[in-house]
């Protein structure tokens, strides 16, 4: 229910972009063990990383871009999201980032990426590219052989069949299977979310944006975000204005997701925008840079905006990835690379494996995952999934990186501290210990695995796979002590860490609060019953079952009850809302 002070839920219930800078995962993982490497001299060492809620692939892109500064290594990224729309965006982003230069130039690729990734509205040319690419991906999803041939870096074999069907439906919706802007009226949906979030402060929304930027984001390290670009994004959803603002008028369908609502006593599926409307997509690539000249200030003001820094960083990222993939493509082992067969395509030096949406608590049952991963990354919205069972999948001495809620404007310092303490407690229970010698970071917390705490034995018949990797030392070296061997390397982006709660849309966004109770936050950990496939996959028999968000008057008193599982981030945000003093913005 909207209160005079607003709902206090600008974070959203599903994440589309990272709320912290990108990380080089090699710098965060333990170094290659020389003993184990000598035993397999002819094999290229591998990095197995498990990422929960990475959302936009920024950490993987950053890792690939920096790979040329490290010894030769191949990568196996295992990605777990809580909604299939996020999986589809991963596929779209990487297919764009790895597009052949002959088909699309570097500048065009970077501009297209920024609009698809962070803008609510698109230019017609970018919308046409989205339709064509989505149609192509929809045809590949259901044909594993063609998918492996055309996108050898992608593996969907671990997804369930119904998830692949739903994924294909997402791409069909993106490709324009349902015509007309009324199918997804983004501008109206954005304004509806904004009104619900601000309440009576809606008419003073420019003042609210100024306060959130100057008194919160700037104080927390994001000084390069300019007030004009932040206001524009808060008002229209357009974060990156690469052309005249009037050129952006086509809804970005990649930001659409479905959720179950209760309408007149019946549970119905509604498509809408349930993402972030408070912080913005500036944190992932826009507040840090290898080129320190981009962060200079003049008369106390940054000379570059977050949008300009983001465009520069993304362009350099794509350039470095393209340069690394060419000469360093791996052909299985060193000997084979010298004389590959002419008809056999070169093996990609990395593979992205997408895991089933509900597999976080069952991975340890499969022996191929027990003690396999040298690195586990968890976003702030997925912290509740960190458990001893998940910790059993990390090799002894492996590292854990947890994103903190530093850039969530709805949380006050007191709630941020409580959330950080809760993260430490959850990590200890899962079998990890903090890196006490590391420099404290407000962006994310770092831990290492204590010994081998595999809970029970796994069933080797469940799934076969390569033997899990082991890290020799009980305590992994600190991330700050790990750096590429080159002397001329650019400074690493320590602050660039992954946030974003990419969790399936909950039902509480519009739930009215009780008299003495804060309104439930948009669930970061929705119950299984509320996790629905994309609307196209549901094929409802009656048109009345699929309603736009405006068809359901906001807020509704008969919305479905909130899920029982409450994540630590949700608790912190609820506390923030309860203790919030009345806000008066003039």
UniProtKB/Swiss-Prot annotation:
Intracellular or extracellular location(s): Cytoplasm; Dynein axonemal particle
GO biological process, one term: motile cilium assembly
UniProt GO cellular component terms: dynein axonemal particle; extracellular region
UniProt keyword annotation of Cytoplasm present: yes
Keyword annotations: Cilium biogenesis/degradation, Cytoplasm
Chain spans, region Disordered: 455-493
Record bears the keyword Cytoplasm: yes
Annotated Pfam families: DUF4470, DUF4471
InterPro entries associated with the record: DNAAF3, DNAAF3_C, DUF4470
Its biological purpose: Required for the assembly of axonemal inner and outer dynein arms. Involved in preassembly of dyneins into complexes before their transport into cilia.
Family stated for the protein in its record: Belongs to the DNAAF3 family.
Protein name in UniProt: Dynein axonemal assembly factor 3
Organism: Mus musculus
Taxon lineage: Eukaryota, Metazoa, Chordata, Craniata, Vertebrata
């Amino acid at each position: 229910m909207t209160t005079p002070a607003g709902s206090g839920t600008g974070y959203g219930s599903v994440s589309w972009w990272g709320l912290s800078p990108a990380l080089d995962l090699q710098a965060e993982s333990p170094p290659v063990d020389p003993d184990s490497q000598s035993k397999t001299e002819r094999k290229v060492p591998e990095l197995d990383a498990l990422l929960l809620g990475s959302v936009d692939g920024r950490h993987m892109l950053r890792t690939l871009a920096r790979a040329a500064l490290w010894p030769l290594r191949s990568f196996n990224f295992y990605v777990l999201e809580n909604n299939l729309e996020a999986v589809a965006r991963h596929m779209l982003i990487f297919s764009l980032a790895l597009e052949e230069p002959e088909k699309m130039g570097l500048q065009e690729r970077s501009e297209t990426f920024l609009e698809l990734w962070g803008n609510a509205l698109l230019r017609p040319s970018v919308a046409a590219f989205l339709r064509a690419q989505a149609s192509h991906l929809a045809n590949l999803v259901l044909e594993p052989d063609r998918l492996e041939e055309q996108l050898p870096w992608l593996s969907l074999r671990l997804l369930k069949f119904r998830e692949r069907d739903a994924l294909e439906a997402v791409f069909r919706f993106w490709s324009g299977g349902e015509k007309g802007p009324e199918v997804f009226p983004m501008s109206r949906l954005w304004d509806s979310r904004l009104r619900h979030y601000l309440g009576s402060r809606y008419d003073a929304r420019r003042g609210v944006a100024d306060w959130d930027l100057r008194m919160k984001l700037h104080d927390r390290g994001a000084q390069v975000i300019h007030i004009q670009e932040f206001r524009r994004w808060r008002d229209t959803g357009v974060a990156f204005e690469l052309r005249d603002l009037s050129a952006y008028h086509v809804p970005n369908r990649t930001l659409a997701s479905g959720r179950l609502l209760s309408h007149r006593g019946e549970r119905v599926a509604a498509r809408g925008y349930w993402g972030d409307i408070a912080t913005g997509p500036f944190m992932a690539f826009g507040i840090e840079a290898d080129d320190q000249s981009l962060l200079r200030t003049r008369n106390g003001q940054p000379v570059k905006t977050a949008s300009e820094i983001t465009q520069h960083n993304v362009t350099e990222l794509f350039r470095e990835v393209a340069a690394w993939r060419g000469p360093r493509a791996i052909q299985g082992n060193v000997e084979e690379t010298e004389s590959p067969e002419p008809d056999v395509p070169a093996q990609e030096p990395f593979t992205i494996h997408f895991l089933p949406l509900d597999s976080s608590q069952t991975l340890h049952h499969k022996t191929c995952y027990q003690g396999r991963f040298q690195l586990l990354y968890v976003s702030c919205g997925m912290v509740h999934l960190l458990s001893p069972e998940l910790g059993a999948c990390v090799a002894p001495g492996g590292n854990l990186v947890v994103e903190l809620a530093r850039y969530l404007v709805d949380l006050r310092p007191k709630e941020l501290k409580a959330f950080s303490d809760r993260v430490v407690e959850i990590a200890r229970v899962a079998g990890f210990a903090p890196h006490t010698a590391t420099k404290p970071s407000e962006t994310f917390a770092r831990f290492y695995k204590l010994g081998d705490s595999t809970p029970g034995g796994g069933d080797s018949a469940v799934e076969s796979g390569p033997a899990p990797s082991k890290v020799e030392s009980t305590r992994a070296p600190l991330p700050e002590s790990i750096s590429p061997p080159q002397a001329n390397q650019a400074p690493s982006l320590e602050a660039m860490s992954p946030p974003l709660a990419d969790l399936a849309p909950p039902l509480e966004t519009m739930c009215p609060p009780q008299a003495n109770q804060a309104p439930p936050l948009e669930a970061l950990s929705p119950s299984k019953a509320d996790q629905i496939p994309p609307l196209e996959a549901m094929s409802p028999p009656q048109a009345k079952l699929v309603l736009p968000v405006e068809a359901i008057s906001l807020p509704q008193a008969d919305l479905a009850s909130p899920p029982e599982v409450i994540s630590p981030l949700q608790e912190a945000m609820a506390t923030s809302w309860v203790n919030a003093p009345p806000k008066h913005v003039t």
